[in-house]
Amino acid sequence: MRRKGVILLDGLMALFLISALAVMVLPLAGSWLSALERGRTGTKLSETGLFAMDFMVEKIRNNRHSAAGGVRGNSYDYRDFTARGTEGTYRFFVDREKLKLQLYNGNIQPLTGEYTGPEAYAFLPGRSSLFRQVEGGPVTISFAMHHQMMGMDRDFETSVIPYADFYKKGEVYE
């Protein structure tokens, strides 16, 4: 039969071993959780940026008119069909760290962003502006998705030629 002091000593030793193990494992678990959070944030930045880029490329590529004159720094005007089947002017623009689309009827739809105030995931125009075009060449789109609190960035840049420019719509073929 064991004495009460020995049982108490066994219990204290077990408690000490468990707490020593916890002290060794908790920093590792904390770093794992931090890495998971950084991965989740990076994935969200990439998803949002790729969605915005894909949407803009498709709309600019299918523009019904030449891109000349449509590029204005952080805004781009393009023509597309409306719900009634007529052509209307749409506009991409940046407002308060969000990419927005102004529809042909004047309504504005956000393409990025979740809130009306400051964004955790900010849409920032790249280099000098969001849209650039040199002498009738391709339209260059450049922007960054930025996470305010973690200081993470994902940069996006591509060029696209509208079909109207590529096929020289409105010009006489010889």
Residue ranges with predicted function:
Residues 1-2, 173:
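Short, low-complexity, intrinsically disordered N-terminal peptides in bacterial proteins
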Residues 2, 6-61:
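Aliphatic-rich helix starts adjacent to a transmembrane/signal segment
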Residues 7, 112, 158:
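Ser/Thr-centric signal marking residues that sit
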Residues 50, 99-103, 163:
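Short, cationic motifs built from Arg/Lys/His that form the positively charged side of catalytic pockets
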Residues 66-136, 170-174:
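Type IV pilin-like appendage domain
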Residues 129-174:
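Short linear sequence signals and composition-biased patches located at protein termini or domain-edge surfaces
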